[in-house]
From Swiss-Prot:
Taxonomic lineage: Eukaryota, Metazoa, Chordata, Craniata, Vertebrata
Origin species: Homo sapiens (Human)
Gene Ontology MF terms: glutathione transferase activity
Gene designation: GSTA5
Reaction catalyzed: RX + glutathione = an S-substituted glutathione + a halide anion + H(+)
Gene3D superfamilies: 1.20.1050.10, Glutaredoxin (3.40.30.10)
Family, similarity comment: Belongs to the GST superfamily. Alpha family.
Subcellular localization, as worded in the UniProt entry: Cytoplasm
Modified residues (N6-succinyllysine): 4
The UniProt record lists the keyword Transferase: yes
Protein name: Glutathione S-transferase A5
PTM sites of type N-acetylalanine: 2
Primary localization: cytoplasm
EC number: 2.5.1.18
Assembly, per entry: Homodimer.
Enzyme class label: transferase
């Protein structure tokens, strides 16, 4: 029996959460080795496990993979979630890059200065409503299929639905004007593997609060 992928990161969302989502959607059981201190991170660095001295790191198929995009590409390819040809992979890459851009904007709200938060949150909401969600609604409307690419579940669908849940935490009304996106969210969320991941007690991580942010600051020294 193949060993479970082992994920090295803190017990928080961060850069690892998309990897957790993708493995869960693929129905892959995983093991997590949490960093609990800066010394834990130093140990990984000192034993040569981190090529570029940073996490996330995933042990899978005899490799110690770092760099989030490389890890996601490998998992998507391994579990047939990365399209059937170069054109489909190009579309998946294009969509996921847009998703990453917006996800990073949302995550950065957590660490911005308190006096800037309201203005920056309003700007992010404006971009969600007027740039990103209309773009993905347009994609689905253009081909009237159940999934973003090739009428088949791909990494892009999973990544987008993960984003929907982050946006919902920010403002649950933002998706209301986009019926095809709402339908996609429901469709993906009801897949047995994803539905299981969305249940309490799974390896999905909760939103970051002040306590978990402080823990991250100590581990990653920022």
């Amino acid at each position: 029996m193949a060993e479970k992928p082992k994920l090295h990161y803190s017990n928080a969302r961060g850069s690892m959460e998309s990897i957790r989502w993708l493995l869960a959607a693929a129905g892959v059981e995983l093991e997590e080795k949490f960093l609990e201190s800066a010394e834990d991170l130093d140990k990984l660095r000192n034993d040569g496990s981190l090529l570029f001295q940073q996490v996330p790191m995933v042990e899978i198929d005899g490799m110690k993979l770092v760099q989030t995009r490389a890890i996601l590409n490998y998992i998507a390819s391994k579990y047939n979630l990365y399209g059937k040809d170069m054109k489909e992979r190009a579309l998946i890459d294009m969509y996921t890059e847009g998703i990453v851009d917006l996800t990073e904007m949302i995550l950065l709200l957590l660490i911005c200065q308190p006096e800037e938060r309201d203005a920056k949150t309003a700007l992010v909401k404006e971009k969600i409503k007027n740039r990103y969600f209309p773009a993905f609604e347009k994609v689905l409307k253009s081909h009237r299929q159940d999934y973003l690419v090739g009428n088949k579940l791909s990494w892009a669908d999973i990544h987008l639905v993960e984003l929907f849940y982050y946006v919902e935490e920010l403002d649950s009304s933002l998706i209301s004007s986009f019926p095809l996106l709402k339908a996609l969210k429901t469709r993906i969320s009801n897949l047995p593997t994803v539905k299981k991941f969305l249940q309490p007690g799974s390896q999905r991580k909760p939103p970051m609060d002040e306590k978990s942010l402080e823990e991250a600051r100590k581990i990653f020294r920022f």
